[in-house]
């Protein structure tokens, strides 16, 4: 049911229902809190204290881990899949005293786990469904998510933090409706509430979020959820498991599952995608934690499986410049044109928006489409002030992630599929964990290991100790740590903050790897890109964090591919060069890595979608319009080469006393360069103006700059463009 269809009468019914449900739960909630506190502070207190001691030694190398995996010794547990769920299972199993192995086809967090909305949801959307549909399962999911959110913020404070999210209200009847729902969320949160929600009036809302549309605005509700760096969080779980003794390797593919004479799975035959080496891994239990690829592994274990249990759904997000949102407040649009929700959030000094939700095929390389991107932009335009021009050219990156939703055969649309999980035991003994969401990865892992121990009769040293178990970088971290990096190493403040919030207490290890700048300030820290705080030393450290490809670095160790595809392209040569030094790559391998990374950025990070928006436009210019566009082209191509380079743009702007940042110059060229050859040809110029005239494009920065300089009407204005 759409949010806007509720009436004032419905509000009263909802509030009454919510009060009844929550009143009945009050006693159980308090009892549950006491049980959790008593259990994990007494039963496993000694074990947890031992495990939470910071390991001073370096991580084992990938070569050491592969040697351990290929020795032929039997593991208690072999996990297939290195996303959030697989990583959580590895950490849980290893800290119970089980000998644990994990293999991942690509990189840790290369799939869905790095392509989320970056929120640690307490489940506010599920609470609405629980109340409106009297759905007890959804309500339990909310309670589970609230506990897990609290735990995640505690065990990795350097990678996560509370984020206030604004819910703007444009109709008076929505005030009590949303207020009662958000207050119910606070109530269910109990002691785990991050901060109490509150209502602010129109002027306060605009002061907090100045770019918000002010027409008919009545006020806004502010509630709190968690936010994190998803790929780094995933990696922190993996690194913690490795430090406790687990053997976890990325870029290792399962070729087949090995079985005994009775058909029971007893391990897997694997292949190292880096070296090509193959071997068998023996295991008493094998766990399938492959997210959207769940069914392919299930079919290896039990070919007679009747039908799939996973229904993948594609969710697209986009990245916009940081000025699109305040640095400390997100926005929730609870009622988009298709009945879903859109989040608009500050993240890593940029702004991310999403998401879409549509059934999808399973693929290793999901790609955002221009249709998805335009849908998100259109929804954003509806909530932002008319003074804010939401431009297609401002989309710095876009990505698609496949949600591993559990299939319900009685429902066709993915909107109704809950993000809960199931644990299946196949006839072959293969354990499959499917579904779920980022926030509840730990609980899913706990239930999975419980089931594995039960089914396979494994002996553990202790029960689950992952609530309260600190992750890599959290042990000695505090929010003022970056000051020590500035004072002790002579780093720029934004660089020090980035290192502290990315590596936690391991930031000092990265700092010691930095080279001198040769300047008075900063003393150390060579930036890879002038607009971002990433350092060349981080590339070297990334190799120690098991980065094997340039994509591993730019997408997951550093998040530059998710933040700005142009900048990612620009730093790639330096990233490949440093990795080549660390890993001994030949010139041919470096060229191959560069090409693969460029393809990844273009295909999976939205660069091609932007080009498609222009390249699919048919030429529709009159003779006069083509002549006008040609004259504008020749103003830039003064030596009549037949194409425009970034040097031509630079010279033109300098001649007209326009100071344009070097990064922006490259972006202006890339937005029009359909052929991706570093040049703008006359045909591409005509294509651009045709798109502006036909309305397929809502604006172009290069055309806008040229109009400002020359003052003559362009096709953008004279030919009916939006």
UniProtKB/Swiss-Prot annotation:
It is found in: Mitochondrion. Calcium-binding enhances the activity of the enzyme. Pfam families: DAO (PF01266), DAO_C (PF16901), EF-hand_7 (PF13499). Residues 1-43 form a transit peptide. Residues 624-659, 660-695 form the EF-hand domain. One of its GO terms (molecular function) is calcium ion binding. GO terms for cellular component: mitochondrion. Its EC number is 1.1.5.3. PROSITE patterns: EF_HAND_1, EF_HAND_2, FAD_G3PDH_1, FAD_G3PDH_2. InterPro entries: DAO_C, DAO_C_sf, EF-hand-dom_pair, EF_Hand_1_Ca_BS, EF_hand_dom, FAD-dep_OxRdtase, FAD/NAD-bd_sf, G3P_DH_FAD-dep. Its cofactor is FAD. It is an enzyme of class 1 (oxidoreductase). GO terms for biological process: glycerol catabolic process; glycerol-3-phosphate metabolic process; glycerol-3-phosphate shuttle. Its main location: mitochondrion. It catalyses: a quinone + sn-glycerol 3-phosphate = dihydroxyacetone phosphate + a quinol. Belongs to the FAD-dependent glycerol-3-phosphate dehydrogenase family. This is Probable glycerol-3-phosphate dehydrogenase, mitochondrial.
């Amino acid at each position: 049911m759409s949010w806007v269809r509720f009436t004032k009468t419905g509000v009263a019914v909802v509030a009454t229902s919510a009060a009844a449900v929550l009143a009945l739960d009050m006693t159980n909630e308090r009892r549950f809190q006491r049980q959790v506190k008593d259990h994990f502070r007494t039963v496993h207190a000694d074990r947890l204290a031992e495990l939470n001691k910071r390991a001073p030694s370096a991580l084992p190398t990938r070569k050491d881990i592969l040697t351990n995996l290929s020795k032929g010794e039997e593991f208690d547990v072999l996990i297939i899949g290195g996303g959030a769920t697989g990583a959580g299972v590895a950490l849980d199993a290893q800290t119970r005293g089980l000998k644990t192995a994990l293999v991942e086809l690509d990189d840790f967090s290369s799939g869905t786990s790095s392509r989320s909305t970056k929120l640690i949801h307490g489940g506010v959307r599920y609470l609405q469904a629980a109340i409106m549909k009297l759905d007890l399962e959804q309500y339990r999911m909310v309670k589970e998510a609230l506990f897990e959110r609290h735990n995640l913020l505690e065990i990795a404070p350097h990678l996560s933090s509370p984020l206030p999210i604004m819910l703007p209200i444009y109709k008076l009847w929505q005030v009590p409706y949303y207020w009662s729902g958000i207050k119910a969320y606070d109530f269910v949160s109990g002691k785990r509430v991050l901060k109490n929600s509150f209502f602010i009036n129109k002027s306060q809302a605009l002061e907090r979020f100045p770019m918000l549309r002010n027409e008919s605005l009545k006020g806004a509700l502010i509630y709190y959820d968690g936010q994190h760096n998803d790929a780094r969080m995933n990696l922190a779980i993996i690194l913690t498991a490795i430090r406790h003794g687990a053997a976890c390797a990325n870029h290792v593919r399962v070729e087949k599952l090995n079985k005994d004479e009775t058909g029971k799975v007893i391990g897997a035959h694997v292949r190292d995608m880096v070296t090509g080496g193959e071997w068998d891994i023996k295991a008493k239990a094998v766990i399938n934690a492959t997210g959207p690829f769940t069914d392919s592994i299930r079919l290896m274990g039990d070919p007679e499986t009747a039908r799939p249990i996973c229904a993948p759904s594609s969710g697209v997000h986009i990245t916009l410049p940081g000025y699109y949102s305040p640095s400390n407040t997100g926005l929730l649009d609870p009622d988009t044109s298709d009945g879903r929700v859109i989040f608009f959030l500050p993240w890593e000094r940029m702004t991310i928006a999403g998401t879409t939700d549509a059934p999808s095929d399973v693929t290793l390389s999901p790609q955002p489409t221009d249709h998805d991107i335009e849908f998100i932009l259109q929804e954003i335009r509806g909530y932002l002030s008319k003074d804010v021009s939401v431009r297609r050219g401002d989309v710095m990156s876009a990505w698609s992630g496949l949600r591993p939703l559990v299939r319900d055969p009685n429902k066709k649309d993915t909107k109704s599929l809950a993000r809960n999980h199931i644990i299946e035991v196949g006839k072959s003994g293969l354990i499959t964990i499917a579904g779920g969401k980022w926030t509840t990865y730990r609980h899913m892992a706990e239930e999975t290991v419980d089931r594995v121990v039960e089914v396979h009769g494994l002996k553990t040293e202790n029960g689950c100790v992952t609530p309260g178990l600190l992750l890599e970088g959290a042990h000695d971290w505090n929010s003022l740590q970056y000051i020590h990096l500035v004072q002790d190493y002579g780093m720029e403040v934004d660089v020090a903050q980035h290192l502290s919030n990315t590596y936690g207490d391991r930031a000092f290890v990265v700092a010691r790897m930095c080279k001198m700048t040769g300047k008075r300030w900063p003393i150390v820290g060579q930036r890879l890109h002038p607009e971002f705080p990433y350092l060349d030393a981080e590339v070297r450290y990334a190799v120690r964090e098991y980065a094997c490809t340039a994509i591993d670095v730019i997408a997951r160790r550093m998040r530059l591919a998710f933040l700005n595809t142009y900048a990612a392209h620009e730093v790639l040569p330096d990233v490949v060069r440093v990795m080549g030094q660390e890993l001994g790559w030949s010139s041919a391998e470096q060229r191959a890595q560069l090409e693969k990374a460029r393809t990844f950025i273009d295909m999976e990070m939205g660069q091609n979608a932007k080009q498609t928006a222009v390249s699919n436009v048919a030429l529709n210019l009159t003779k006069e319009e083509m002549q006008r566009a040609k004259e504008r082209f020749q103003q830039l191509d003064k030596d009549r080469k037949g194409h425009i380079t970034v040097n031509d743009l630079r010279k033109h702007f300098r001649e007209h006393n326009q100071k344009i940042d070097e990064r922006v110059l490259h972006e202006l060229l890339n937005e029009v360069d359909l052929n991706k050859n570093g040049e703008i040809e006359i045909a591409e110029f005509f294509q651009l103006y045709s798109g502006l005239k036909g309305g397929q494009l809502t604006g172009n920065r290069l055309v806008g700059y040229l109009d400002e300089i020359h003052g003559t009407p362009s096709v953008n204005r004279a030919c009916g463009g939006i």
